[in-house]
Amino acid sequence: GRSIYSVGDLYSGYDQFQLAVDSCDITTMRTPIGLVRMCTLPQGATNSVAHIVNAMNKVLKDCIPSITMPFLDDIPIKGCSDEEKDESEDKDGCRKFVMDHMKDCEKVLERLENANLTFSGEKSAFGQPEILVVGHLCGAYGRKPSPSKVNVINDMKEECVTQMEVRR
């Protein structure tokens, strides 16, 4: 486990990736208000996930795996391990391991800014003792499944009847 974490989620993740101009026409669909043509990466399209994974790996290549392991548009930023943790204070009274973590956060943010990508302020958190990443809680204790996800399974009826019950 780690003593400090941060997590960022891209603001409208898929919408931040522009489609090639010649690809826009093949996304055209009819709606009650007329034809709509996508100009950004459509969420749920066959190759959208692969495109996001490749783009994030390219943008953050020098930060993977030492600082982050992005999952689609979720970007967890891990602090130092307990073995590397330096509790000494700098001249401003901030612990060194916290400052090191903030420098790592800055490095990730710079890479995203250079790629014209933006974090969502509402869905991002910095300098936290625990974060939720892809259904798992990460903290000083290590990683464990989120209790809310486990409770859904524990509270499940013996037999699922509807599609909605199966999906939960």
What residue spans do the PLM features occupy?
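Retroelement reverse transcriptase polymerase core
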Residues: G1-R168
